């Protein structure tokens, strides 16, 4: 028979926290996250919770982490690949100075427009340049132009996991030396350590190998320093050093 601790662990892949205890995660949210969550972010989080694909959103604790991180590095020029309804985008916009900019790319404008009224009401829409469509062609054009090399303070990637390595090959040229790239979902619901016969959802099993490949590549990349954190579904921060 399982102990109380075992009963409290997340049994179903898809939970946004990697903590072993639901109660402990709820404690963090209720003690440190929700009481300090800006009203606009709370509103967008509650709107997104009604979306059938709400698990795609950035968790509230990760949003808080990103917001503080951006302030600590004094970010001004940023990029986000994978927007969904815009919760992490809103966290970023709130952290940037009034003349800060975010190039935001997603293949689905409809989801972005769910959160856009909240962003507009918060007076932050002027910071966002939203582009609908695949990000790779945009990145290739930016690299070809030449003027964008080393121009970004921070880049956040929360998109198609099978293209993470393709993004990295390009983003390393676009982020400045000393700047950060954040890759989301790098622990992928904990599946990175799941045994081969573990009962995983089809999409989790499919993308797991891409996440494993990314993690291995980042750890071996001499151009960056890395820090992998168990926040949300796992986020790996890469600081460009050369």
Swiss-Prot record:
EC number: 2.1.1.104
Domain of life: Eukaryota
Family recorded in the similarity comment: Belongs to the class I-like SAM-binding methyltransferase superfamily. Cation-dependent O-methyltransferase family. CCoAMT subfamily.
Residues involved in S-adenosyl-L-methionine binding: 58, 80, 82-83, 88, 106, 135, 160
Binding site for a divalent metal cation: 158, 184-185
Lineage, opening ranks: Eukaryota, Viridiplantae, Streptophyta, Embryophyta, Tracheophyta
Pathway membership, UniProt: Aromatic compound metabolism; phenylpropanoid biosynthesis
Gene: CCOAOMT
Keyword flag Transcription regulation: no
Organism: Solanum tuberosum (Potato)
Main function: Methylates caffeoyl-CoA to feruloyl-CoA and 5-hydroxyferuloyl-CoA to sinapoyl-CoA. Plays a role in the synthesis of feruloylated polysaccharides. Involved in the reinforcement of the plant cell wall. Also involved in the responding to wounding or pathogen challenge by the increased formation of cell wall-bound ferulic acid polymers.
Enzyme class: transferase
Keywords, ordered alphabetically: Lignin biosynthesis, Metal-binding, Methyltransferase, S-adenosyl-L-methionine, Transferase
PROSITE patterns per UniProt: SAM_OMT_I
Required cofactor names: a divalent metal cation
A Pfam family reported for this protein in Swiss-Prot or TrEMBL: Methyltransf_3
Name assigned to this protein: Caffeoyl-CoA O-methyltransferase
Co-factor binding details: Binds 1 divalent metal cation per subunit.
Reaction(s) the record says it catalyses: (E)-caffeoyl-CoA + S-adenosyl-L-methionine = (E)-feruloyl-CoA + S-adenosyl-L-homocysteine + H(+)
Binding residues for substrate: 16, 158, 189
Biological processes annotated in GO: lignin biosynthetic process; methylation
Recorded GO MF terms: caffeoyl-CoA O-methyltransferase activity; metal ion binding; S-adenosylmethionine-dependent methyltransferase activity
